[in-house]
Amino acid sequence: MAEEGAQKATGKIKSVVLILSGKGGVGKSTVASQIALELANGGNKVGILDVDLCGPSIPRVLGLEDKDVHQCADGWIPVYADKNEKLAVMSIGFLLRNSKDAVVWRGPKKNAMIKQFLSDVVWGDLDYLIIDTPPGTSDEHITVAENVRGLNLTGAVMVTTPQAVALGDVRREITFCKKVGIPIVGIVENMSGYTCPNCSECTNIFSKGGGEALAQLTQVPFLGCLPLDPKLTMSIEDGKSFTELYSESPTALAIREIIRPLITS
């Protein structure tokens, strides 16, 4: 019954993609937002759902902090990030009186809110629904896994950084996905080197290649590397699409390579 309710409220969704990370601070929401923006730039109808209830970042990275969600007879109407209404957004950040308020909830209340997000948002028909999840593995992840089974789940994109501690956490995330039956689209290594804003040369300030090595070890596809790019940071601060502003940059090309399996799946 929950699955039927989700389909009725959300409309037809062709592909659901989860964005996961084993730990916080690896740029998961940045990757989620850039995937959603690039898919929308390609003419797709895209929704992005922020279920990181205690740390909602999507309104900030898309420049939508001052927006409000409205209700209709069928549920919540999402916020649109563009005039053409190609990118719809839903986050608990839109429901807080003050965007800086802390969400201090126990597990059952968080799970109830996630279920409501997955059943009561009036997306309309979507080509893609990108779900930005909290870091780690918790009750919230189990709730998401249980409630997307009735939808067209393409799988999960894992976001990590090159450091060993982040890679270890992602390995546990991969185990979680296998246990709950979530297909894995692949691994993205974020913050993989620093791109100079003047000459575009990439310098490895952390270790490099850990994400690809982990992908080989766990037999999971490796989707590519994203460097620390000051221009990407600036575009996020302005709530703009990086791939539109810097379409020929190495980072933009890397983002397009990352979404290729989502388009062809």
Swiss-Prot record:
InterPro entries: Mrp-like_CS (IPR000808), Mrp/NBP35_ATP-bd (IPR019591), NUBP2/Cfd1_eukaryotes (IPR028600), P-loop_NTPase (IPR027417), YlxH/NBP35 (IPR033756). The keyword Oxidoreductase does not apply. One of its GO terms (molecular function) is ATP binding. This is Cytosolic Fe-S cluster assembly factor NUBP2 homolog. ATP binds at residues 22-29. Binds 4 [4Fe-4S] clusters per heterotetramer. Contains two stable clusters in the N-termini of NUBP1 and two labile, bridging clusters between subunits of the NUBP1-NUBP2 heterotetramer. Its cofactor is [4Fe-4S] cluster. Its main location: cytoplasm. It comes from Trichoplax adhaerens (Trichoplax reptans).
